[in-house]
Amino acid sequence: VLSGVGHSARDTYEMLHKRNVEMTVKPFAIGVRIEHDQAVIDESQYGVEPSSLGLGAAEYSLVYHDKETGRTAYSFCMCPGGQVVASASENGGVVVNGMSLYARDSGVANSAIVVNVGPDDFGTHPLDGVAFQREWERKAYELGGSNFHAPAQTVGQFLGLSPAPSVQDSTY
């Protein structure tokens, strides 16, 4: 039997494990969601206002392969003209996702920026990946004020290039 439940079906994983169903550890990706002014992305991709070309809001895709570590960081689920939305499946954890509005006209682009992780990062027990996710979701919850607000910072802060002004605008 092959089960294709989603990554948030943790109660299902735990129930199957308790019933001694054979489970295999799988690598996955974990990361953050980044927001940009959509006009900056449009200019970067098209060089002009997209409507002047009869186009909608621009998308992008980024990939970086680190040959030394074997890790890959990449953009995922890029949402032009959208917003960041809450996606937590458990109390005490913060998870966010992105979505585009139908017209893709919110003026804000967002994308997940993720990195691959595997058993070397979280362990070889079948439920170690679940524990790893929960740990990071709990840390995000605490950093956001323990009220389901997502922690936020600028790219400059994330990269250690700028002091810590407060984030002025976020769709979340």
For every predicted segment, state its role:
Residues V1-Y172:
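Residues forming the flavin
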